[in-house]
UniProtKB/Swiss-Prot annotation:
It catalyses: sulfate + ATP + H(+) = adenosine 5'-phosphosulfate + diphosphate. Disulfide bonds: none annotated. GO terms for biological process: hydrogen sulfide biosynthetic process; sulfate assimilation. This is Sulfate adenylyltransferase. It comes from Chlorobaculum tepidum (strain ATCC 49652 / DSM 12025 / NBRC 103806 / TLS). The keyword tRNA-binding does not apply. Its EC number is 2.7.7.4. The gene is sat. It comes from the Bacteria. Coiled coil: none annotated. PANTHER family: PTHR43509, SULFATE ADENYLYLTRANSFERASE (PTHR43509:SF1). Belongs to the sulfate adenylyltransferase family. NCBIfam families: PRK04149.1, sopT. CDD domains: ATPS (cd00517). SUPFAM superfamilies: Nucleotidylyl transferase (SSF52374), PUA domain-like (SSF88697).
Length: 404
């Protein structure tokens, strides 16, 4: 059996990253263009366009695609797309840019020239409307809402040429991979069914259990961690990488998992982001996405299994990548094993509920971590990391993190 097709009607990867002489000449041309500064989120989105992770998109969305994506998860041409991919700027700068003009795209933090775009459309949006549709809230305390409300007032749309993958290939050498690279690895391993495990946390025992369930039913699992920006208090990607490496080395059969990373910032859009996670994992070659409790959520904005239910609400055939829906998992003292609500008949008092938030809070506050929460080799790495922190971040517990 072959791997799943890339997303879109043409079913072929569309990486927009330039190479060779074309890259040299286009970068030279871009030096004389007006510069549009990119936020961290926009830079990550541009890199995903570059490597084909956002196939079949050819650039940042125009108004019709923005509206369709926001309101019905469907672009103007009928392509399924659950979260808008947009680029914004100030009204003052937008007024200086003509339709049809090419602009240089520069990462605001590093100053690196990342690409160029031919501006085909300029439009304003109702940001609060986007937030209510995508995040199901316009509460400014929601980190994804804050991100959208703080962006520029005018969206610029058009096809892009991508010049760079930023620091990801060097900073995360051996982990950061493109869809072409993961597909090649899957084929070399003889895998046709591959489950993706989305993570922004070091893997505790519950995560390990989810991945092992997937290993039982698929040829392999891509442990696919986010390498872009998170919220304060989250654990950095290099620490997560080391934790996952030691876990897979000590507790998984060799050749059943691959660890990789992708360049996006977290949006914290809960169910909608779960759909986006499945969509781009299709481009990376994954037939399934593991969807556990409160996937891509934050705080108490979403129900623990809203991300399960949303896959039942999308049109049939919208995605080739299917969800592996797994119930609430925990360690049960009476079962003396990891279990789920489907497999364990015992009382809540007999269970140790595991969550990344809970683990971060215990480590941050120097508390003793219960024996069955995480593997000792993983805890050793995390304790070293927390011991080296000079500034502590207050980690708030939400209901899903404490088993409510």
């Amino acid at each position: 059996m072959a791997l799943v097709n890339p997303h879109g009607k043409e079913k072929v990867l569309k990486p927009l990253l330039l190479t060779g002489d074309e890259l040299v000449s286009e970068k030279e041309r871009a030096k004389s263009m007006k510069q549009v500064r990119l936020s961290s989120r926009e830079t990550g989105d541009l890199i995903m366009l570059g490597i084909g992770g956002f196939t079949p998109l050819t650039g940042f969305m125009g108004h019709a695609d923005w509206k369709g994506s926001v309101e019905t998860c469907t672009m103007a041409d009928g392509t399924f797309w659950p979260i808008p991919i947009t680029l914004s700027t100030s009204k003052e700068q937008a007024d200086t840019i003509a339709i049809g003009e090419e602009v240089a795209l520069v990462d605001d933090e590093s100053g690196e020239l990342m690409g160029s775009m031919k501006v085909e459309e300029k439009y304003c949006i109702d940001k609060a409307h986007e937030c209510r549709e995508v995040f199901k809230t316009d509460d400014p305390a929601h980190p994804g809402v804050l991100m959208v409300m703080n962006q520029g007032d005018v969206n610029l749309a058009g096809p892009v040429k991508v010049f760079s993958e930023g620091s990801f290939p060097t900073e995360f050498a051996g982990i950061y991979m493109t869809p072409a690279q993961t597909r090649k690895m899957f084929e070399e391993n003889g895998w046709s069914t591959v489950a993706a495990f989305q993570t922004r946390n070091p893997m505790h025992r519950s995560h390990e259990y989810l991945v092992k369930i997937a290993v039982e039913i698929c040829d392999g699992v891509l442990i696919h961690q986010l390498l872009g920006k998170l919220k304060p208090g989250d654990i950095p990607a290099d620490v997560r990488r080391d934790c996952i490496n030691v876990l897979t080395e000590k507790y998984f059969v060799k050749g059943t998992t691959i660890q990789a990373g992708y360049p996006l910032d977290m949006r914290y859009a809960g169910p909608r982001e779960a759909l986006l996670h499945a969509l781009f994992r299709q481009n990376f070659g994954c037939s399934h996405l593991i969807v556990g409790r409160d996937h891509a959520g934050v705080g108490d904005y979403y129900g623990p299994f809203d991300a399960h239910h949303i896959f039942d609400q999308i049109p049939e055939g919208a995605l080739e990548t299917k969800p592996l829906k797994i119930d609430w998992t925990f360690y049960c003292y009476k079962c003396d094993a990891m279990a789920s609500m489907k497999t364990c008949p015992h009382e809540p008092a007999d269970r140790l509920n595991l969550s990344g938030t809970k683990l971060r809070k215990m480590l941050s506050e120097g508390e003793e971590v219960p024996e069955h929460f995480s593997r000792p080799e993983v805890l050793e790495i995390l304790r070293r990391y927390y011991a080296g922190l000079t500034e502590k971040v207050d980690i708030k517990m939400h209901s899903h993190a404490i088993g409510k």
